[in-house]
């Protein structure tokens, strides 16, 4: 009904929230895709961005925030909060499944007639076939494979080491190209618990008594 009045709709989902458990969140998302074929789904991975939300303090107290370089904190190339109710393989299996379902030829074909005007129709097709759709399926599938085959990636995601795996380091070097050499020392590392540490160092406010001024 909304598409009668608004030519293009994108629906945003955040995957990996603490309330998510089991297969149900992924199954319900697939159900949404079936019931609202005209809406373009955009999936984001749970991320803690510094002081962006007080909830980040809880993640840091629990030791769940990972030191991913800022280069990857774009909501889809890395999830810097360890999921509460999933192992990493379980989470990526669900993520890949729902992403494949959302950008399958069947879903793309149903999205076209559900959209009224020509430009939004083609935008849905192009976005699904680009890095936003098929590209992310390929990337997430690669991460899932590395979880089984590259111990450095698995240890990093489990929070057992803060040494950035070669896979991520090489990607930064490749994407920055000639600009990579200008990165300062330590640019790919940061303290993931800086917010918590700064909050614990903030001095407590002392009560101040206000005395009424005596009439002269």
Give the residues covered by each predicted segment:
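C-terminal non-catalytic accessory extensions
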Residues: 134-216
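A structural motif corresponding to the C-terminal lobe/cap of the Radical SAM core domain
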Residues: 1-120, 124, 146-148, 196-197, ...
């Amino acid at each position: 009904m909304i598409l009668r009045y608004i030519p293009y709709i994108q629906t945003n989902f955040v995957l990996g929230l603490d309330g998510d458990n089991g297969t149900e969140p992924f199954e319900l998302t697939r159900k949404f895709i079936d019931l609202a074929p005209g809406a373009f789904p955009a999936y984001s991975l749970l991320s803690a961005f510094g002081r962006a939300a007080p909830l980040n303090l809880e993640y840091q107290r629990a030791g769940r925030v990972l030191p991913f370089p800022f280069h990857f904190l774009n909501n889809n190339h890395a999830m810097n909060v360890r999921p509460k109710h999933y192992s990493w393989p379980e989470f990526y299996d669900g993520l890949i499944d729902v992403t494949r379902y959302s950008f399958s030829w069947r879903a793309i074909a149903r999205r076209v007639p559900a959209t009224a005007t020509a430009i939004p129709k083609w935008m849905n097709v192009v976005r699904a076939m680009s890095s936003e759709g098929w590209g992310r399926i390929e990337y997430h599938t690669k991460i899932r494979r590395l979880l089984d085959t590259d111990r450095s990636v698995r240890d990093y995601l489990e929070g057992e080491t803060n040494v950035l795996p070669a896979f991520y380091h090489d990607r930064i070097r490749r994407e920055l190209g000639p600009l990579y050499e200008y990165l300062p020392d330590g640019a790919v590392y940061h303290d993931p618990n800086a917010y918590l540490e700064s909050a614990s160092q903030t001095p407590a406010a002392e009560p101040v008594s206000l005395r009424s001024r005596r009439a002269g």
